[in-house]
């Protein structure tokens, strides 16, 4: 039932004021044993996952980031009582002794948030936060970028990947959560009349890499101000 509730409503019941969320997270992390190993995010359905807490790491940097992602998830993910009932009906059909009786009592109580049972806590010692699955996957990269931002030195982070792999989503999150500017390669298309005849067979053959280098990478690497001139594909102008 807890899994059903979490996959339906996400971390809504754990969200609140950012300061409270952060204090609770820091307190929980500080109590974890140092040898508690990191685990990959655990998908729980409906676009959500459990991000497990580890016993080591720089939580003074990671905890605020995780708190922000939790609050973003709570604001963006919305479930309904009907969605929860669909999950409970599926659970009721499982051949588990006592499930039907337990769910009957749970429904009469109004289906409140569910806590892990003592037996589950003893067996698994759960410590995690529920995030959107994408946010759980992005977290290591976001944390690495946060470390660069904290260094106080100019830094350039390149995000590469296949079409539709989440590059823009990660970049947007960095822009929302970190003190940085995001430059999209979509703004640096090469005008069609300047492309090679076989540009489709050339990696980045449709990109104006020379302009991107001179207007963005060189000044950004030197800590200087960049001049962003997006290319408008419709008008063919900058």
Positions of the model-derived regions?
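N-terminal pre-Walker A segment at the start of P-loop NTPase domains
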Residues: 124-150
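Short hydrophobic/aromatic beta-strand immediately N-terminal to the Walker A/P-loop
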Residues: 156-158
């Amino acid at each position: 039932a807890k899994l059903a509730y979490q996959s339906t409503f996400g971390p809504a019941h754990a969200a609140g004021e950012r300061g409270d969320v952060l204090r609770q997270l820091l307190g929980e992390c500080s109590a974890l044993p140092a040898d508690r190993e990191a685990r990959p995010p655990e998908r729980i359905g409906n676009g959500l996952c459990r991000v497990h807490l580890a016993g080591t790491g720089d939580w003074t940097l990671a905890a605020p980031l995780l708190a922000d992602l939790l609050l973003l998830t709570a604001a963006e993910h919305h479930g309904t009582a009907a969605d929860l009932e669909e999950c409970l009906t599926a659970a009721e059909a499982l051949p588990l002794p006592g499930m039907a009786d337990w769910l009957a009592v749970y429904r009469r109580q109004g289906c409140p948030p569910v806590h892990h049972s003592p037996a589950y806590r003893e067996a698994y010692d759960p410590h995690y936060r529920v995030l959107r699955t994408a946010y759980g996957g992005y977290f290591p990269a976001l944390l690495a970028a946060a470390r660069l931002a904290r260094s106080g030195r100019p830094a350039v982070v390149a995000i590469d990947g296949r079409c539709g792999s989440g590059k823009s989503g990660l970049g947007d999150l960095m822009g929302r959560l970190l003190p940085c500017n995001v430059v999209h390669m979509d703004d640096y298309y090469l005008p069609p009349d300047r492309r090679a005849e076989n540009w489709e067979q050339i990696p980045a053959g449709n990109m104006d890499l020379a302009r991107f280098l001179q207007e963005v990478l060189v000044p950004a690497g030197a800590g200087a101000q960049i001049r962003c001139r997006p290319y408008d594909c419709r008008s063919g102008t900058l």
